[in-house]
Amino acid sequence: KGNCYLGIDAGSTTTKVALAGEDGELLYSYYNNNNGSPLHAVVEALHEIDAQMPKTAKIVSSCSTGYGEHLVKAALNLDFGEVETIAHYYAAAFFDPDVDCILDIGGQDMKCIRIKNGVVDDVQLNEACSSGCGSFIETFAKSLNHSVQEFAKVALTAQNPIDLGSRCTVFMNSKVKQAQKEGATVGDISAGLAYSVIKNALYKVIKLTDPSDLGKHIVVQGGTFYNDAVLRSFERISGCHAVRPDIAGIMGAFGSALIARERYEDGMETSMLPLEEIFAMSVDTSMTRCKGCTNHCLLTINKFSNGRRYITGNRCERGIGKEPNAENIPNLYDYKLHRTFDYEPLSDEKATRGVIGIPRVLNIYENYPFWYTFLDR
């Protein structure tokens, strides 16, 4: 009953959806693998919301975040979009208003967000490699014929966790196979992997030297922390107590819903498409090379049945068909050219002391306005 606020976190491997009420209470949540199609997963969640939401309730504001933020926002015409760090902070602050450190481990990324005086002060991310994240554990669980839930459960009773360090996945894979040959149990391997995920986060991403540097109010989140073994590994390695919300995996979506709630103003009409249009919408995806310049960017063009489109892969605005705005954006190269060479030399009659040639090379080239003024005036 009343106003509802929709938050969508289109992640790299999973899609999360949250619906919040007027007081920030969680009314609905969705968490599932997107199988490479976050938009399809979002529509699936909206079908569930439509089936469960009474007529006395309505979605009045919406916000997206995550890897697919712009795609989902463009497809559904959502009201707002926000970067992941802010969305995660809003969610963490809802559970602990004094939070000063947020550790988020997702499917293919991990980040540490430090909060100072109520604002984001620093963000540390894993770099190009995604080893040691949630999909890393999932891959090993499947290779050992276990579900992720079973794999996490057996880790809690492991007697001799194997030491895998925090190296590259390729080397760790070899280490796991070697441990199996030496008789290590699945539980020992799972516990070792849980330790390695935390070691990677603390020592490779955050580059921690003293556990006290993490802060006094730590919130851990991300789907990987649904794994109790990972949470326990964090507590044992860092020696810190952390808050893990029971909705750790959908904190990005929940934070987006809270942002949608905060930015909503009485009487505001949502720009989000009606659910009937969303359910009837189709998407046509094609790829082409941009011919705007010599980069020849590979563009992915998503065309929606309602006429809108969303383009990715472009390195500049030419790729999305935007023309340069000559009225508002100055052409600095054109300005530099005219500023440098739009000087009229003295006539032969006035140049009584002869002619001096200024080479258009090196720093003399850019210093020509100085030399012209110095010699002429």
Question: Language-model segments: which ranges?
Answer:
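Gly/Thr-rich phosphate-binding beta-strand-loop-beta motif of the actin/hexokinase/Hsp70
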Residues: 1-23, 99-116, 293, 298-302
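Conserved phosphate-binding/catalytic loops in two-lobed NTP-binding clefts
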Residues: 79-85, 235-254
